[in-house]
Every structure is written in C-alpha cells, then in structure tokens.
C-alpha cells in the first residue's frame, strides 16, 4: 500500500533520489511528497496489459507497455536531467516512455478508463464484452468516464480527444471476457 511505502522512502531516499510512482492512484506523487520531502517525487502512470497465466508466470497477451511521468504544476524541476535519462533508458529497453509536461492530463486520461471500467464491472458484475455494446453497462461506463472528464476540465486540463470515444476504442480491442485488475483482486 501507499502508506507502507512512506517509511521505506523516508529511510532510503535522499535529495539525489528520483521517485516515479506508477500506481493506479491519481496524484500519488503529491501524496508521497508531503511525507517524504527530501527526494524528487514525480507523478506517473503506466499502461500495461498482463495477467497471471499460472503460479509464477505472468504473460502479456498484447504488447502494451507505456510509461508517462513528469513534474506536477508548480513543482521545482530538480533532477530534470536524471528524469530525461530515465526516459531514454526505458526507451532503449523497448518501453514506450514519455517524460511529459502534461502528467496530470496523462494520468487523468488513464484514470478515466481504469476507474470507470473497474467500478462499473464490479457494480454490474460484468466483463469487457458487456461494455462494448449499447445498453445499461455501456451507459454507466460512459457516465463515469464523462464525470472524470468534467473533473479534468474543472482542473484546467484540456484533453486532446473525447475520453468516452477513446475508451470505447480501447474496449473494442479487448476480449469479451476481459476484466480489470480491480475485478480480479
């Protein structure tokens, strides 16, 4: 959990440490920074599609592996060269990495999919296929997506595309029996 991470970071991190949290929690960096002021703690998010195939075996059914990270608005840009180096190192390993000036937009864009699909999937006890077709499941999903989109606009975030349409396109590419990690946990 996030709370369990704080004592560890307080013990090992210094002013020369760069932390890039990639949890599915919006604003993780700011939360950690309040308890751990010494290191530079960015915000980040990750897109990866993986699943447990068998005990000890994790597979990627589709090659989705993207990482976004960056400074929050108003955050001092300490260790910027190191953050750029992390981006380059990740790219050299084949990861689609982005050190961005718009991390809040990127993180909220991701959150606009994972949170609504997880919550609606649990609430309705449905898998991905139910959200692909017009009906109650898709309507609930899109309502939740648009709530997050509205929140983003209120925060001053301008999205490049309609998040509802974007997230329906994501669903099109998934198997009908797909579930989120929230549902599997």
Task: Identify the residue ranges that each predicted region occupies.
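Rossmann-fold dinucleotide-binding core
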Residues: 23-110, 116
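Hydrophobic alpha-helical packing residues
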Residues: 9, 86, 90, 144-152
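Helical "substrate-binding/catalytic lid" subdomain
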Residues: 104-185
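Short, conserved clusters of charged catalytic residues that mark active-site
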Residues: 4, 27, 181
């Amino acid at each position: 959990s996030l709370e369990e991470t704080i004592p560890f970071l307080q013990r090992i991190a210094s002013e020369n440490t760069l932390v890039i949290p990639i949890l599915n929690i919006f604003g993780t960096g700011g939360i950690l920074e309040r308890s751990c002021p010494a290191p530079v703690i960015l915000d980040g998010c990750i897109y990866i599609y993986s699943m447990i195939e068998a005990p000890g075996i994790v597979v990627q059914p589709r090659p989705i592996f993207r990482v976004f990270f960056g400074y929050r608005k108003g955050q001092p840009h300490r260790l910027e060269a190191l953050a750029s180096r992390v981006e380059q190192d990740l790219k050299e390993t084949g990861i689609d990495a982005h050190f961005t000036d718009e991390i809040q937009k990127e993180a909220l864009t991701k959150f606009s999919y994972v949170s609504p699909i997880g919550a609606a999937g649990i609430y309705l006890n449905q898998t991905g296929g139910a959200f692909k077709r017009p009906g109650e499941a898709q309507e609930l999903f899109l309502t939740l997506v648009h709530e997050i989109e509205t929140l983003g606009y209120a925060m001053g975030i301008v999205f490049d595309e309609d998040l509802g349409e974007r997230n329906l396109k994501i669903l099109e590419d998934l198997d009908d029996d797909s579930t989120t990690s929230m549902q599997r946990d």
